[in-house]
Amino acid sequence: MGESRPLYMMIQDYILDQIRKGNWKPDDQIPPERELAEQFQVSRITAKAAIVGLVNKGYLSRQRGKGTFVAHVPGPGKSLERMPVHSAAEGSKKLVGLIIPWVEFRYFSLLLSGVEEELSKAGYHLIVKRITGLETESQTIEAFLGIPVDALIIVTSPGEHFNEDIIRLVLDKYPVILVEKSMQDIRTNSVYCDAGKGGAMMAEYLMGKGVRKIGLVTYPPRFTFGVKARIFGFQSALVAGGVPPLSDDLILSVTPDLLQRSDDPEIPEEIIRFLSEHPELEAVATVDAMLAKLVGKACYQMGRTDMRIICFDEPSYSKNSVYPTAYIDQSPVEVGRIAVRLAMEALEGQQEPKKCVIEPRLVELS
């Protein structure tokens, strides 16, 4: 495959070749990660992934504070021939890491079921870590590479920009699959729902029910590209339907920190205040199921049980709450399945990145 192979594998091939030729003998120290990264023009995180992979396979050993050395004897049944593309060829446990920020539990469980189902078919095991921010994301990536995992499926953290570690891994052709987000300028494997179309479907549903007094509860547009697309799609559909777009006072942006607290946070005061200031509202659209749950609880608490609520993602049941009348299904189970298929293709040497866009679906509940 030449240069089309993932660069961390090329580093592993180089190290094994030096050992096989006798250039590096048992107990010899190999070049540090920094030098290997410079030699192969890759990031240090990719060089580290290559080294740790060989340590875990018995070819190298690490000594704290000293460096990495050639092991005395390869593991049982090992040879110093070319390393396989992934650990499956050696019969070791095959692992894929899933990194996901704190999201509404129902969405998380559905996505997870799709990932597990497809990985089971492929004979892989799954390691999952829920994270709370970019710093935790970087730490988790490093920890997973140190295990090592064969591929990473990452539901990217909120924010306008990608974690630099993810960008480096993608550029170094490490098997990374992005969920819910795609890089604009760098080709990579990704799977996500058409958020703009989903936002439009929410507005069309409400207009179809004859509702005109509408509020929107969201996160700041910079929170994720998906949120920005949902808001744009929603507003565009209102205009196309002959309804003026929502003014700023009818759009509430809630701090995303509530997603990092628990699966059942307290009702934010700003939601109570928003509903109190707009007694005329007949319906509220929200950009995810967590916000729908909080709006529903607030409406129940305030006696506004006739409020029509629509959201993205299937809502989980919550007592003492006004339940949504409809939601936009992003097919999280299928998203999970596709993410795994993309990972398997990458591990099998498929070098052409794929961008898979899922069509949203409106599900009416009552």
Predicted regions and their residues:
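Extreme N-terminal segment that seeds HTH/winged-HTH DNA-binding domains in transcriptional regulators
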Residues: 1-39, 52, 77-84, 355
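Amphipathic helical "hinge" segments at domain boundaries
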Residues: 9-10, 78-150
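Flexible loop/turn connectors
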Residues: 14, 18, 272-366
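Hydrophobic alpha-helical segments within soluble ligand-binding/sensing domains
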Residues: 190-216, 236, 264-272, 292, ...
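Periplasmic-binding protein-like
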Residues: 97, 149-157, 177, 215-218, ...
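Flexible loop/hinge segments that line or gate small-molecule binding clefts
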Residues: 155-198, 290, 313-325
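Short beta-strand elements in bilobed, periplasmic/extracellular small-molecule ligand-binding domains
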Residues: 119-131, 235-264
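An alpha-beta-alpha
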Residues: 202-244, 352-366
